[in-house]
Design a protein with these regions (language model features):
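Hydrophobic alpha-helical membrane-insertion segments
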Residues: 36-53, 179-189, 382-389, 458-473, ...
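Hydrophobic core of alpha-helical transmembrane segments in multi-pass integral membrane proteins
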Residues: 38-47, 99, 187, 294, ...
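Juxtamembrane "helix exit" motif at the C-terminal ends of alpha-helical transmembrane segments
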Residues: 390-396, 401, 469-480, 604-615
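Hydrophobic transmembrane alpha-helices and their helix-loop junctions in integral membrane proteins
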Residues: 86, 92, 96, 100-141, ...
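Membrane-entry segments of alpha-helical transmembrane domains in multi-pass membrane proteins
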Residues: 1-9, 25-32, 75-93, 131-144, ...
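Hard-cation-handling environments
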Residues: 448-510
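Transmembrane helix-loop-helix hairpins at membrane boundaries of multipass inner-membrane proteins
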Residues: 2-5, 21-120, 193-214, 239, ...
Length: 615
């Protein structure tokens, strides 16, 4: 376990070396440092995970105090690494999937300006996420939280010479900062009430000090939920994620699969004891997830950009995780987080291969017929898409998503179950719409398959993990998270499995019926009045950007214009202006004429005499 600090120190050192190189290193050397540092981190993590399983720590968790960070009066905080079943799972996902993404990126980014800078940012991204999941208190978690936010800004705006990319990065930074402010308020409340931010101490003290439904706990968990929805792109702070596709495709894979958007799920799961004492907020978590997964599913139906389709699918899949957390299916949420990392990384990396092969074309309707020219990318999309659609029994996504649906049913949340089934149907339609349109039909562009081990190896490994093989990896969460109500199954569970599987297959068949062949019905529907109305609405993500522009952006810009005219200084400027005006008037009396002075004396005396007589 003494190797545990190396998991985040290796990528941190990689970031420093690449930063100090200032782009003077060759691409091979930059790739060696950038990929190698994450590879060493993954090896360190593998050893830590092996040690955790082979020699289980007493109490099911291992703590390693590195140093005392701060001490002031009665307050002190140590920088301590905490490893239990939950952080072991996250450690494996972040370093394992992160390494595969870095390896693929070494191929994808060849020839790009800022090759070293790219790997410097991604190394810092991995280090920040590991800082987040290994810290034993919410303060250090928050530092990692802000670190991944900063890295997302840098990577989304990587092609900063394009103004739209800079705007997308700024939008992501601002929207997620809104959630971060809420989270900071939550930390203030918790520290004020308990005098500590150590997570394990909070989980012990909370039920001792407060009854279920306590106002302070409700406010604190609501604030933490605000932070989680911002970072995990859930309603109402989901608008940044689709625009985040402006960055390089491996960045999208990192954000969606291995790092940033899973942070909100991890936060709620890690603070599970606080949320169970605030049942109204826990219920709200499930509702937020259910609404998000349905709205994102409809939005994905009409997107034409291959990466934006996958971005909408990420919002939807994270919605399933929030739904699971909301019904108390803690294990199922983390299980789906893990399997989602496998197939979503696969889909994004495969989309990167397609984009490079098609000369950076991202519109799926300008592709077509790619299955013969890009067999590995096609296989990746078929397997990853099947896992995303939860094709029964063969894919990892089926087992994790089915567990969520069963827990929703077993806990009596029938409305959330219906939302999950609707989302499953939409997912299978939009996923295979992408596959049928991009890979089948008439070719519309020239495409050339990529080569090299850094291209095919990550895709091949993720293909295997996206099948049922990935579902065999069970997160060691026993004793870490509360046992869910639907832990045991039976006839009802098997029936639900068959129903959800049938829904997924029905969606795939419907997608084939609509998008293989002439697509006349789809074209006619899109041109109809209802089709244009809903298509525009869904394409623009239900109009949230328009609404926020009217409610927040335009009033803010108007306020900036008003303040730019300096109204305060102008108002205060009336005083010196009046004094100067009075002085100028009085100075007119100093004209050097004796008659004027005599008249002034007589006039002044008359005024004084009149005042005395009137008094």
């Amino acid at each position: 376990m003494n190797l545990l600090p190396l998991t985040f120190l290796f990528p941190l050192v990689g970031f420093l070396l690449l930063s100090f190189s200032r782009g003077r290193w060759s691409e091979n050397l930059s790739a060696l440092v950038g990929v190698g540092s994450v590879g060493l981190s993954a090896l360190s993590a593998a050893w830590a995970i092996f040690s955790f399983h082979s020699s289980p720590p007493e109490g099911g968790a291992y703590s390693l105090v590195l140093w005392q960070w701060m001490a002031a009066g009665d307050f002190s905080t140590n920088f301590t690494l905490y490893l239990d079943g939950l952080s072991v799972t996250m450690l494996g996902v972040v370093t394992g999937v992160g390494f595969l993404i870095h390896l693929f990126a070494s191929w994808y980014m060849r020839g790009e300006t800022g090759y070293s800078r790219f790997f410097a940012y991604t190394n810092l991204f991995i280090a920040s996420m590991l800082f987040l999941v290994l810290g034993d208190n919410l303060l250090f978690l928050y530092f990692g939280w802000e670190g991944v936010g900063l890295c997302s800004y840098l990577l989304i705006g990587f092609y900063y010479s394009n103004r739209n990319n800079g705007n997308a990065a700024l939008k992501a930074f601002i929207v997620t900062r809104v959630g971060d402010v809420f989270m900071a308020f939550g930390l203030f409340i918790l520290f004020q009430q308990f005098g500590t931010l150590n997570i394990q101490e909070l989980l012990v003290l909370a039920p001792q000090k407060f009854p279920e439904g306590n106002l302070w706990l409700t406010l604190a968990t609501l604030a933490l939920l605000g932070g989680a929805v911002g970072k995990s792109a859930q309603l109402p702070l989901q608008t940044w994620l689709a625009d985040a596709m402006a960055g390089p495709t491996p960045v999208s894979a990192l954000i969606h699969a291995a790092t940033m958007v899973t942070a909100g799920v991890y936060l709620i799961a890690r603070c599970h004891g606080l949320f169970t004492l605030a049942p109204d907020i826990l219920e709200l978590v499930g509702i937020v997830g259910a609404v998000t997964l349905v709205l994102a599913g409809f939005a994905a139906l009409v997107q034409t950009d291959i990466k934006r389709i996958l971005a909408c699918s990420t919002m939807s899949q994270i919605g399933y995780m929030f739904l699971a957390l909301g019904v108390g299916a803690w294990d199922a949420a983390i299980f789906h987080l893990m399997t989602h990392a496998f197939f979503k990384a696969l889909l994004f990396l495969a989309s990167g291969a397609v984009i490079v092969a098609c000369h950076h074309e991202q519109n799926i309707f300008k592709m077509g017929g790619l299955w013969k020219k890009l067999p590995l990318a096609y296989a990746s999309f078929v397997v990853g898409g099947a896992a995303l659609a939860a094709l029964p029994f063969l894919t990892a996504g089926f087992y994790s998503k089915d567990e969520i649906l069963w827990e929703a049913f077993a806990s009596g949340h029938r409305e959330l179950l219906i939302a999950g089934l609707v989302g499953a149907f939409l997912t299978s339609i939009y996923t295979f719409r992408l596959i049928f349109v991009a890979f089948h039909g008439e070719p519309k562009t020239e495409a050339h398959a990529g080569h090299g081990i850094s291209h095919w190896l990550p895709l091949s490994v993720l293909i295997v993990l996206s099948t049922f093989v990935g579902a065999l990896i069970t997160p060691p969460l026993a004793g870490v998270l509360p046992e869910s109500v639907g832990h045991a199954g039976g006839e009802a569970k098997h029936s639900l499995e068959l129903a959800s599987g049938a829904i997924a297959i029905a969606g795939i068949l419907l997608a084939g019926l609509l998008f293989l062949g002439q697509r006349r019905f789809v074209s006619a529907l899109a041109k109809s009045a209802p089709g244009r109305f809903f298509g525009t609405w869904w394409y623009h993500a239900w109009g949230f950007d328009w609404l926020y522009d009217k409610l927040f952006v335009k009033p803010y810009l108007l306020l900036c214009q008003l303040l730019g005219r300096d109204p305060i200084d102008r108002t205060l400027g009336v005083v010196p202006f009046s004094v100067r005006g009075g002085h100028n008037l009085l100075s007119l009396t100093e004209n050097g004429r004796l008659r004027w002075y005599a008249a002034s004396l007589v006039g002044g005396a008359a005024i004084l005499l009149g005042a005395l007589l009137l008094a």
